[in-house]
Amino acid sequence: VWMSALFMCLGLGYIFNFLGVFLDVFFSIFTGVPATDMNPVMDALDELTPGMVIYTCLIAPFMEEFIFRGVLLKKARRFGDRTAVVFCAVMFGLMHGNLNQCLYAVVIGLILGYVAVRTNRIFYNVLLHMAVNSFSMMLVLVENGLNVLGMSAMAAAFSVGSFIMILLLIAAGIYFFF
């Protein structure tokens, strides 16, 4: 379950992040607000500090899993596991504070909720969340590094390659999950 959940989180998270970026651009056309201003995290990713990396990859996953799957899910399970998982996933998405992150956080929250209910502990969730955030951070660091070096075409190719890899991860996750 753990490995297939990781594949599903990485794959579906990437797909829904892409959808969120598309929606940011779509709404940008109608509102006149630049798409880059709709996701405040984008500014932070351009100026990463070691503290930001540590927080994103280690501290935030622990805190978020404790709150959403450790406390909230446990309390909400009296309404049924399915309802509790969906409720916690939506709350997890909304907590991220913008449309782009909300979309993929809800999807990842559904998977993490399933794992928490299935295993009845959040230890695996913390590890999964750390792995997902670390993988995302690695993609950002590589892409930022390529752009800084003036290799925008290579950064674009890296993004396309990442997308293909993510589709393969989803397929593997579905294969092992079901």
Locate the predicted segments by residue.
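Transmembrane helix-loop-helix hairpins at the membrane interface
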Residues: 51-178
